[in-house]
């Protein structure tokens, strides 16, 4: 927890990030650490344009993509951009929960020949909704090694959804929070139609306890560079619960 509380000062380090020029204005790629990149895609929800963030890792075997661009119209542009920059193909895709901004690319990546993964819980939800599913599934927690690169998928508990997981890159000390972590500029909890707000706080604490030495947190939407996102998420949950209590 101590490491997470000190993340604010690290925001200054983002001024040196390398931003790549993309042909598609709805895709932005920024280098975060060594071979780890944050990609941001944009889409419209209920008339408002939002940014969705995720990451990809360039390994000696190929590229590992966490989640997917938000919208089918961006899939090919995204993979073309990766090949143009790195000369490598996507070999693995992992969805951090069942929503389209995370699992929407499973079918596309699978057709490219990439190994696609999700938790069994996410797979069950996708099956019920008759949506494309990952080829491989696993229980809530799993460690991966691709070439020389190691990373871990961790299920902290319910929050934004029942099935949300985070991804930890230990060498770079980067936590991909997905949608269970709200950005520092979020005004509220966002879409909570499938949320478990009463469980969310404990799930965030589980993340803090599991990964006490995080240096960078990539929130699922909007400004991922604001490293107050973990604490801000807790604050937003508390505010929501207080409002609910006052209205009852």
UniProtKB/Swiss-Prot annotation:
**Could you tell me where this protein is found in the cell?**
Periplasm
Q: Where does substrate bind?
A: 182
- Domain of life of the organism in this record? Bacteria
Q: Where does Zn(2+) 2 bind?
A: 101, 179, 221
Q: What is its EC number?
A: 3.5.2.6
| Record's function text | Confers resistance to the different beta-lactams antibiotics (penicillin, cephalosporin and carbapenem) via the hydrolysis of the beta-lactam ring.
Q: What reaction(s) does this enzyme catalyze?
A: a beta-lactam + H2O = a substituted beta-amino acid
Q: Which GO terms describe its cellular component?
A: periplasmic space
Q: Which family does the record assign?
A: Belongs to the metallo-beta-lactamase superfamily. Class-B beta-lactamase family.
Kindly provide the name given to this protein in its UniProt entry. Metallo-beta-lactamase type 2
* Keyword Signal (UniProt): yes
Q: Which PANTHER family match?
A: ACYL-COENZYME A THIOESTERASE MBLAC2, METALLO-BETA-LACTAMASE DOMAIN-CONTAINING
Self-association or partners: how does it assemble?
Monomer.
Species name for this entry?
Elizabethkingia meningoseptica
Parts forming coiled coils: none
Annotated CDD domains = BlaB-like_MBL-B1
> What's a Pfam family this protein contains?
Lactamase_B
Q: Which UniProt keywords apply?
A: Antibiotic resistance, Hydrolase, Metal-binding, Periplasm, Signal, Zinc
UniProt GO BP: antibiotic catabolic process; response to antibiotic
> Which residues participate in Zn(2+) 1 binding?
97, 99, 160
> What does the note accompanying the cofactor annotation read?
Binds 2 Zn(2+) ions per subunit.
